[in-house]
């Protein structure tokens, strides 16, 4: 089976697990993320506006915005890295590419921490996204300039120890789930 076929199969299984976990989400997951982000108060960070069954980081983003700049990703074109627009709680939002909400006014910012949505993850820091490569290109670009922390935010059910990965896949530094924090590279 080709790598692309293995990735498609892994995505399909992970989407089903994520959907089931999302149905049980009582909204407490964001507190674990808030706890992690509290150690980085004031550091520019980017979250994301959850879509469909993605775990929602909004409460943690609102808390972080009280201490420093928070952005959300903006897709500028196929094959391009993401840019980030400054987000403020309660600010006007509009539909962006693929239906993700983006700020109505685009004040660009550069994050040092990315809270990353995903379809599946591994404890080794592997991340399977939707297949567009946006976060891989973005992390590669940001990490070429400075240390950039990538925090996966997911349901524990999205873990896949046999994640099919490519050399261009950028690793996560940690993963936050409703069951706790997984620090990549630490036993």
Show the residue positions of the predicted features.
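Surface-exposed, charge/polar-rich loops and edge strands
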Residues: 1-5, 9, 16-20, 105, ...
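Short glycine-rich anion-binding loops that position phosphate/pyrophosphate groups of nucleotides
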Residues: 50-53, 119-123
């Amino acid at each position: 089976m080709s790598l692309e076929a293995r990735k498609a199969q892994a995505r399909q299984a992970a989407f089903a697990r994520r959907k089931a976990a999302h149905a049980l989400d009582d909204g407490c997951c964001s507190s674990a993320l808030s706890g992690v982000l509290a150690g980085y108060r004031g550091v520019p960070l980017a979250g994301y506006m959850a879509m469909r069954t993605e775990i929602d980081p909004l409460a943690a983003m609102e808390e972080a915005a009280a201490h420093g700049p928070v952005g959300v990703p903006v897709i500028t074109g196929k094959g391009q890295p993401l840019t980030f627009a400054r987000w403020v709680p309660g600010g006007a939002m509009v539909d962006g590419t693929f239906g993700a909400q983006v700020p109505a006014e685009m004040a660009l910012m550069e994050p040092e921490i990315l809270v990353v949505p995903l379809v599946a993850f591994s404890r080794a820091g592997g991340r399977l996204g939707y297949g567009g490569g946006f976060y891989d290109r973005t992390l590669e670009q940001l990490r070429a300039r400075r240390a950039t922390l990538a925090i996966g935010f997911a349901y524990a059910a999205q873990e896949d120890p046999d994640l099919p990965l490519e050399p261009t896949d950028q690793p996560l530094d940690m993963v936050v789930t409703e069951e706790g924090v997984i620090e990549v590279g630490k036993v």
